[in-house]
């Protein structure tokens, strides 16, 4: 059995708890309606994509190695904040209620803006000069 670093698991847990709490707080602001754009899920997914792009690039290319930053911020915080599965459930609900155009737009825009957010964050991190 592999030897686990429980401090790394604790970092994932702590980051995941913060991300999930942020997502739950934002989701509580809107009542789900398959006839409307699901702004809470859309927002956390695009913001989370930007953050994971930022954290991944910054941690891998700009900061000294740390065994806890990436599990805390990437896997934990961003993993707890974002929710691809909820996006899928919302899309199916739109389809089941006959909102095919909204479902297609939501899927395409969510994935496209998520990819653009990761790319933008990566570009921004790489443009910032390291101060010494």
Swiss-Prot record:
Na(+) is not transported, but it plays an essential structural role and its presence is essential for fluoride channel function. It is a multi-pass membrane protein. One of its GO terms (molecular function) is metal ion binding. Its main location: membrane. Pfam families: CRCB. GO terms for biological process: cellular detoxification of fluoride; fluoride transmembrane transport. One of its GO terms (cellular component) is plasma membrane. The chain crosses the membrane at residues 11-31, 37-57, 70-92, 105-125. Na(+) binds at residues 79, 82. It is found in: Cell membrane. Keywords: Cell membrane, Ion channel, Ion transport, Membrane, Metal-binding, Sodium, Transmembrane, Transmembrane helix, Transport. It catalyses: fluoride(in) = fluoride(out). Fluoride-specific ion channel. Important for reducing fluoride concentration in the cell, thus reducing its toxicity. Belongs to the fluoride channel Fluc/FEX (TC 1.A.43) family. This is Fluoride-specific ion channel FluC 1.
